[in-house]
Amino acid sequence: MGTEEPARKFYTAPMTRYAEVAAFTTVPGQGNRAGVVLDAGELTGEQMQRLAAFLEAPETVFVTRLSDGLGRVRYFTPTQEVDFCGHATVALGRVLAQAGRWRGEALELETLAGRIPLRLVLDAGGGECRVWMHQPAFGTRAVGRGWHRELAEALGLSDRLLHRGLPLAAASTGLWSVFLPLLDASLLEGLEPDLPRIAELSRELGVVSVYAYAPVGVNRFAARDFAPLVGIPEDPVTGSAGGALLALLASEGRLPLRGNRASGLIYQGHALGTPGEIEVEVEVRGTRVEAVQVGGCAAVEREGVWPG
């Protein structure tokens, strides 16, 4: 008689649910893609990085804690962790609202860039929502004229096409970018970015991205944002940089004020076929930026499970 084989035990690792979201748009497939993971408290940083690479969204946000109006989050590109991401934060707000885990009560997120208060605005029917986020503190620094030609040429342009009446500078509301003003929005469509050179210039200037922008109205701008240094050849619609741009313009008196507030719109993503729209409000005292808020809509595209 043969011996009876003991019953086998099978162990499976817990699977992680995620959502893929289009931010700064109400149309799936447009705007800027973000991954959202609501229950990431048991994931290691290495697992978060692998999941972000798996999703291949420009950024993925992971919620490691959420209770009593306070959340703790981390942001990853497909190649590395970053301090903050605007469009992923808008996407997170949408997912929380759709899941019934946020109904507009006070909510703050702890990020590597500081605490970010969120505000939820529902439409009259309660279907669509707009997520507003307070940006981290605004900062700016000069970019010497010696860099102007190199930056323009890295985008395939002559420096004669730079707008001399708008600021060319580095600025941040969470992530540093260098902002390059162009004479006309039509120039954005014809950019020929040299991505290795842009990455090199970004490293030398201590920024995450090179952001080209042009006016299309008194307080409206079109833009493209290149971030190959952090694994994003072109970011479709960039909330953090959009906030920094409008804050930079307001600090230099280039936006109309109502009292001590300026507002504006940024259109981005058209060159990639994924248009989106960013709303920005800036509070200023003289030339000092006291607060920046960025808002937008988002649409959940799909949900899935990552087996790890």
UniProtKB/Swiss-Prot annotation:
What does UniProt list as catalytic?
59
Give GO MF terms, alphabetically.
Answer: isomerase activity
Tell me its EC number(s), please: 5.1.-.-
Stored SUPFAM superfamilies: Diaminopimelate epimerase-like
One GO BP: biosynthetic process
One GO cellular component assignment for this chain's record is: cytoplasm
Q: Does the keyword Isomerase apply?
A: yes
Q: Does the keyword tRNA-binding apply?
A: no
Q: InterPro entries from the xrefs?
A: Phenazine_PhzF-like (IPR003719)
- Superkingdom is Bacteria
Alphabetically ordered keywords of this record: Isomerase
Please state which protein family the record places this protein in.
Answer: Belongs to the PhzF family.
Q: What is this protein called?
A: Uncharacterized isomerase DR_1330
Could you tell me which species this protein originates from? Answer: Deinococcus radiodurans (strain ATCC 13939 / DSM 20539 / JCM 16871 / CCUG 27074 / LMG 4051 / NBRC 15346 / NCIMB 9279 / VKM B-1422 / R1)
The organism that produces this protein has a lineage beginning with:
Bacteria, Thermotogati, Deinococcota, Deinococci, Deinococcales
